[in-house]
Amino acid sequence: MIDFDGYRPNVGIVICNRKGQVLWAKRCGQNSWQFPQGGINDNESAEQAMYRELHEEVGLQPKDVRLLYVSKHWLRYKLPKRLLRYDSKPMCIGQKQRWFLLQLVSDEKNINMQTTKSPEFDGWRWVSFWYPVRQVVSFKRDVYRKVMKEFASILFTDNPLIFSTSREANSQHYSANKKYSQTKYTKRHFYKSRGQ
């Protein structure tokens, strides 16, 4: 489904833990990282799409998370010309996204990136709250900056839940079902990576 302006309606998902860190996911077979996201199907609300994508991409059920906040506005980004599919009709020039802030309330062992035959991600880790803004691919950076600024006002001021504002990233790195070897994937490796 693409709107009249050429944007595909989409949901973005930020999952935080009780330390205020956020789940950062590694795209399959790539050294690029991003938040979970996905398109909204016909006759599907943004919230329904979010829970579907949450299960498909992260393996979590509604009972595993608490919905803390939904972005007030749709946020848009344009795809770079090299990613446009000029032969598709109608042509999609970018995404318009409604963002959801969730808190993980179940055990993180329930996170499983391998729930579908064609998974989007093959690994994940917890990172400090602002880390994704600096690391995501450049054409998504403005959207990430806006959504994280909006979510920060909820997590760190208005929300009664207590979060640490530490900018220190968790040093544990996870695959879909097992921990990444720290000898193979060093902290330097992760900090140099870029999301897509």
From Swiss-Prot:
Claim: Ion transport is one of the keywords in the record: no
Pfam families, A to Z: NUDIX
Main enzyme class: hydrolase
Cellular component, GO annotation: cytoplasm
Record-listed E.C. numbers: 3.6.1.-
Boundaries of every Nudix hydrolase domain copy: 6-149
Cofactor(s) needed by this chain: a divalent metal cation
NCBIfam families (UniProt xref): PRK00714.1-1, PRK00714.1-4, PRK00714.1-5
Name this polypeptide is given: RNA pyrophosphohydrolase
Organism, scientific name: Haemophilus influenzae (strain PittGG)
